[in-house]
Amino acid sequence: MYLRRFYFIILVYANLKMEYDTKDKTFWKRKGNDMKVLLGAVNAKYIHSNLAVYCLKAYAEKYGDTSDEISIGEYTINQQLDEILRDIYKRKPDMLCLSCYIWNLTYVEEICREIKKVMPQIIIWIGGPEVSYDGVKVLERLPEVDGVMKGEGEQTFCDLLHFYQDK
């Protein structure tokens, strides 16, 4: 547990401008209202569904102790990139978390690059088997991404929500 949290902080610190509270000895970035979080999945086919994003949402709602608004957006690799970007933009999330697999990695990377152009303040996190094995290299390759979730994501996602929530 401690090692995972240490790794989590390293990845966050690598790409975010953060403040340090010397009194509490804690880091924080966001203050204010609850966030709108979009869990995104790019599936191989229209009939497929991404179990990971539903598990993350269910776990966060049950154990997360957060009032952030969490929604799910499922897309397919057959959809036009503009259509996906338009949907994300219409939802106006503060944070976008994307699930990465071998069949959607290049598409997810393109989404990250393009959505950051139209929504520069959006926080982008990615996770899944195609990116969690070497988060540092992924962050170097994708400067638009703010962090990589490693391993089982449920508790890490809750930690992430708390990280951005008011202290």
Language model: regions and residue ranges:
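Short hydrophobic targeting helices and cationic amphipathic motifs
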Residues: L3, Y7-L11, L16
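Short hydrophobic alpha-helical segments enriched in small aliphatic residues
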Residues: A14, D21-T22
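Nucleotide-activated donor-dependent transferases that construct or modify glycoconjugates
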Residues: K36-K45
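Glycine- and acidic-residue-enriched helix-capping/strand-helix junction motifs
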Residues: K45-Y54
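Glycine-rich beta-alpha loop elements in corrinoid/cobalamin-binding modules
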Residues: A52, Y59, D68-K167
